[in-house]
Amino acid sequence: MITAQISHVAFLAARIILMILFLLSFLVTAFFVERLLFFRKRLLKDLSPLLSALELAQSKTEIRAVLENAGRSETALILKGLQETNATEASFRKTVQAFLYPERKQWERFSVFLGSVGNNAPFIGLLGTVLGILKSFADLSLVASGGPQVVMAGISEALIATAVGLLVAIPSVIFFNICKVYIKRSLNHVNALMDMIGAKNLF
């Protein structure tokens, strides 16, 4: 009786784990697509044309016009630093850094989730496999005939959970790393823009 209950509970738990993994797979894909669209819409793709335009600017007014024309998150941060008419270069940089913190949180949205799924999905799949194996041995004690065939069939089915866990984890890690590349590139863009404007000695 207890063995039958163990088999039933292990079966249900293994199925729930597979459902969780499939749900995580859907969420990972949805969040990554959202992030990819966000990055392509809001962040600078190539900084070179903007730096060339800024190099030709001779005043803060011209710099603001160039930045406003770009219309990206990085340029919006620089514009906030240029709001004060009598700002020094030091205060300009501090203002940009202050506004960068909340902006960076927007850039990093869902990154923790993607990284966590990438790190933990294999273990969730492994748990499903352990439960599947537990069910197989419980079934073996309930079946009078069948012997090793019952166990092997159950183990083969249980290993699906590990495979699914890996199939969820690998794309999650790839997506997480892609997001990190976008964020790091944008941070470098902000620093490069500050350096370019600071080098013009307009403060």
Predicted regions: what is each one?
Residues 1-50:
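Hydrophobic membrane-targeting segments
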Residues 7-14, 101-118, 149-160:
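Alpha-helical membrane-interface segments at transmembrane helix boundaries
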Residues 14, 27, 33-34, 118-121, ...:
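Residue-level micro-sites within transmembrane alpha helices that shape
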Residues 20-27, 121-124, 128-131, 166:
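Residue-level signal for the membrane-embedded core of alpha-helical transmembrane segments
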Residues 28-31, 37-38, 106, 160, ...:
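Hydrophobic side chains within alpha-helical segments
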Residues 42-146, 174-203:
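Predominantly long cytosolic amphipathic alpha-helical stalk/bundle segments
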Residues 158-174:
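Hydrophobic alpha-helical transmembrane segments of polytopic membrane proteins
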